[in-house]
């Protein structure tokens, strides 16, 4: 038992658990393993999203909080370059007034957006936290039922298990699968438009969103779409590892 049981040990779940634990709360994290969907080689933290350049809700505040928190645990690679078509520049400029940025010939550099490596971040966030490794089979309020017959409950249950376990609590949502390729080339400054390049990773979301969770295998069309997007950004096709 604990005051707060966090179901899921990805970046979201471990961040919440660590913040509560640092404030003296009795916390227990329940997960099969560290990470799940939070284990790609690179994670991009960028408040200006998509081809429509939508500023995330409370994007400025969230970015400042992410810089301050994640920077305690792992190196942050500052700067995300967003190519911006000429016709979109007035619209984008109006959304950047409170973000530190610099216009360049082809677009805008978000100077405090960044990328990081999630795997060392997960390990550092988990240090010292009470972590129960196990597969959750069901939610029978107030109990989480684990494989093997174990049961866990908390005064508060926080779900942070992503799309894979959402059915346990009857949660619904739109799931958008993505693909990340590991590269032989290295991009110290992230660049993002349709796809993103950062460090030794190329990623993006090619498939349409779905109501139910599934993990589709990569397709030749998806890989080709990523490589075409990368070529449009940097003028050549990066080498895939």
Model features per residue range: what roles?
Residues 49, 187-241:
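Active-site lid/adjacent beta-loop-alpha segment flanking the redox-cofactor pocket in flavoenzymes
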Residues 42-107:
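Dinucleotide-binding Rossmann-like beta1-alpha1 core, especially the glycine-rich loop
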Residues 154-191, 219-222, 233-238:
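Central helical "cap/lid" subdomain
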Residues 2, 147-156:
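Core beta-strand elements of the Rossmann-like FAD/NAD(P) dinucleotide-binding domain
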Residues 22-41:
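Glycine-rich FAD pyrophosphate-binding loop
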Residues 132-144:
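A conserved short coil-to-beta-strand element within the FAD-binding core of flavoproteins
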Residues 53-65, 107-124, 217-222:
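Short beta-strand to alpha-helix junction loop
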Residues 2-28:
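N-terminal Rossmann-like FAD-binding beta1-loop-alpha1 element of flavoenzymes
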């Amino acid at each position: 038992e604990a005051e707060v049981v966090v179901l899921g040990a990805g970046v979201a779940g471990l961040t919440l658990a660590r913040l509560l634990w640092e404030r003296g709360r009795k916390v227990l994290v329940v997960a099969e393993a560290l990470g799940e969907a939070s284990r790609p080689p690179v994670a991009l933290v960028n408040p200006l999203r998509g081809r429509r350049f939508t500023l995330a809700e409370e994007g400025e505040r969230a970015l400042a909080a992410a810089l301050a928190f994640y920077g305690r645990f792992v190196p942050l690679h500052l700067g995300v370059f967003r190519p911006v078509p000429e016709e979109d520049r007035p619209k984008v400029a109006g959304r950047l007034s409170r973000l530190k940025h610099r216009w360049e010939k082809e677009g805008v550099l978000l100077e405090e957006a960044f990328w990081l490596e999630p795997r060392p971040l997960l390990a550092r966030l988990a240090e010292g936290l009470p972590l129960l490794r196990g597969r959750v089979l069901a939610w029978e309020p107030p109990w989480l039922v684990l494989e093997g017959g174990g049961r866990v409950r908390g005064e508060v249950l926080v779900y942070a298990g992503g799309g894979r376990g959402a059915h346990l609590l009857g949660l619904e949502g739109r799931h958008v699968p993505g693909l990340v390729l590991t590269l032989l080339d290295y991009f110290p400054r992230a660049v993002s438009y349709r796809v993103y390049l950062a460090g030794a990773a190329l990623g993006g979301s090619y498939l349409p969103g779905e109501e139910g969770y599934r993990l589709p295998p990569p397709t030749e069309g998806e890989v080709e779409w990523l490589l075409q997007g990368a070529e449009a950004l940097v003028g050549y096709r990066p080498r895939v590892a």
